Regions:
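Glycine-rich beta-strand-centered segment in the early N-terminal region that forms part
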Residues: 22-39, 49-88, 95
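C-terminal hydrophobic helical "lid"/dimerization subdomain
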Residues: 34, 266-318
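Short glycine-centered segments of the SAM/dcSAM-binding site in methyltransferase folds
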Residues: 81, 137, 161, 226-227, ...
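NAD(P)H dinucleotide-binding glycine-rich loop of Rossmann-like/cofactor-binding domains
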Residues: 81-143
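Short, glycine/polar-rich helix-capping loops at beta-to-alpha or helix-loop-helix junctions
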Residues: 89-92, 167-174, 238-243
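Mid-domain Rossmann-like dinucleotide-binding core that forms the NAD(H)/NADP(H) cofactor-binding site
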Residues: 120-188
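Short amphipathic alpha-helix with an adjacent loop that forms part of the alpha/beta core around
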Residues: 190-200
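Glycine-rich phosphate-binding loop and adjacent beta-alpha segment
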Residues: 213-283, 318
Length: 318
């Protein structure tokens, strides 16, 4: 089989290699999956760069999220379509613990299935963690990202008002159409001024995917006693925290990682999360964008396309 690996951490376009390997044999608790589609997430790039919360054991395969079909399993018939996460999905076959497989809902395409877990469950989980209620205000950074679009749509269904930031004013109308209340171009508009005009006391919560100065400006938009969940670092810069702001406004800043949150859930909560998120994704009201697809052998083109500014949809490796 073909697989994409890296023997050292660094820029994906520089360190990734395509090699031939034997198809693995599943152990008793595992299933062999033929992968049919993968999407590229920020965590994939950070993992290759050695910047993620999981340290790669070199040489390592890349990719965390995929959709595929069961090839061998003691529990599922051959050909059963499944969704899963694993370390190293940029390959043709992978062995996955059978208990971690999620059957793909009937009618869900591979284009959606291969991105049905990481971003949608993150959006859902952060909304659950925040405790936001109908009528409250949420500010998110990276509003035009796949995660941002899902937060906007899920929040709208809950009656939560969303303000989001973008780096390109051309993206504003599309996000308004999805349900954002206000969209702010951080390159040309004053975020704090716009937020204060809409919500004089400040927003109830902030979800930050960017970090750096943009994260600091978002933090300053919180109301007294507000809460900020930090889950991304797209800027690769730390947030410069204003201690006085934290103290006198009694603000709470927390890290949020999907892996830790998911592991904290009981089985019933996991079932409910999957059911609710997949219901969202299967409704015609929810938009899941794909910009471009590449073959596994075109992985370098895929990572270059992923890193282009102004992208409006996911990059898939099929």
């Amino acid at each position: 089989m073909k697989q994409v690996i890296f023997k050292e951490t660094g820029l994906p376009e520089s360190v990734l290699l395509l090699e031939e390997a034997a198809i693995p044999e599943p152990r008793a608790h595992e299933s062999l999956i033929r992968i049919t589609a993968r999407n590229i997430n920020p965590s994939d790039i950070m993992f290759i760069q050695g910047r993620y919360g999981i340290t790669p054991k070199l040489p390592s395969s890349a990719g965390f999220e995929a959709a595929g079909e069961v090839e061998k399993s003691e529990q599922y018939p051959k050909g059963t379509r499944v969704i899963f996460t694993a370390i190293g999905t940029w390959k043709e076959y992978v062995c996955v613990p059978t208990a971690q497989l999620i059957p793909t809902p009937e009618g869900m395409s591979d284009d959606v299935a291969c991105q049905a877990f990481v971003n949608p469950i993150t959006a859902y989980g952060m909304l659950e963690t925040s405790g936001l209620q109908k009528g409250q205000w949420l500010l998110i950074t990276a509003g035009a990202s796949a995660w941002g679009k899902l937060v906007i749509q899920m929040a709208k269904m809950r009656g939560i008002q969303v303000i989001c930031t973008v780096r390109n004013g051309a993206q504003k109308q599309a996000l308004m159409d999805l349900g954002a209340t206000i969209v702010v171009d951080v390159h040309t508009e004053n975020l704090g001024k716009i937020v204060r005009a809409a919500v004089e006391t400040g927003v109830d919560a902030v979800f930050d995917a960017v970090g750096g100065e943009q994260g600091a400006k978002a933090l300053a938009c919180l109301k007294i006693g507000g809460r900020m969940l930090v889950f991304g670092l797209l800027s690769l810069e730390p947030i410069p925290l204003n201690s006085g702001l934290l103290i006198f406004k009694n603000l709470k800043v927390e890290g949020w990682w999907l892996t830790s949150w998911w592991e904290s859930l009981g089985q019933e909560s996991i079932k409910n999360a999957i059911k609710e998120v997949f219901t969202y994704l299967m409704t015609q009201e929810v938009q899941v964008d794909v910009q471009e697809k590449f073959a596994l052998s075109e992985f370098k083109k895929a990572v270059i396309a992923y890193q282009k500014e102004g992208r409006t949809g996911k990059i898939l490796i099929c």
